[in-house]
Amino acid sequence: MSRRHAAEKRQVLPDAKFGDMVLTKFMNNLMIDGKKAVAERIVYNAFDRVEGKLKRAPVEVFHEALENIKPAVEVRSRRVGGATYQVPVDVRPERREALAIRWLINASRARNENTMEERLAGELVDAVNMRGSAVKKREDTHKMADANRAFSHYRW
């Protein structure tokens, strides 16, 4: 692996229906086996359900849900003299977004509704209302960082 140049960040194209780049990233993460059309259908149908439940623009709901899931701090392992410490560090904006998307998808997949559309819609509604597994994951991450605040001077 060459150390000369950092890999170039590729721009994702905005999605067809709403023209939103974050939504495209979300669909790409949701996609399994390269089936983008299936991922798009799941997201758009989930958005229709969300719009029916909350009577609000689904893209706004999506972004609000992501904001409620994004972590501000996380812990990273750091070895110091034979001991491993969990050191709290701030999360970069790109990683915040990536973690929020990943947690939202995993929380949706873990739910008990029948279809992925229902699960995703339910998790989005829960995230907007500060409930649900994805928000709990963020809260747990923040608690972990808070509990290990004593080791913050090991930050690098």
Swiss-Prot record:
Coiled coil: none annotated. One of its GO terms (molecular function) is tRNA binding. HAMAP family: Ribosomal_uS7_B. Keywords: Ribonucleoprotein, Ribosomal protein, RNA-binding, rRNA-binding, tRNA-binding. InterPro entries: Ribosomal_uS7, Ribosomal_uS7_bac/org-type, Ribosomal_uS7_CS, Ribosomal_uS7_dom, Ribosomal_uS7_dom_sf. PANTHER family: RIBOSOMAL PROTEIN S7. GO terms for cellular component: small ribosomal subunit. One of the primary rRNA binding proteins, it binds directly to 16S rRNA where it nucleates assembly of the head domain of the 30S subunit. Is located at the subunit interface close to the decoding center, probably blocks exit of the E-site tRNA. GO terms for biological process: translation. Belongs to the universal ribosomal protein uS7 family. Part of the 30S ribosomal subunit. Contacts proteins S9 and S11. This is Small ribosomal subunit protein uS7.
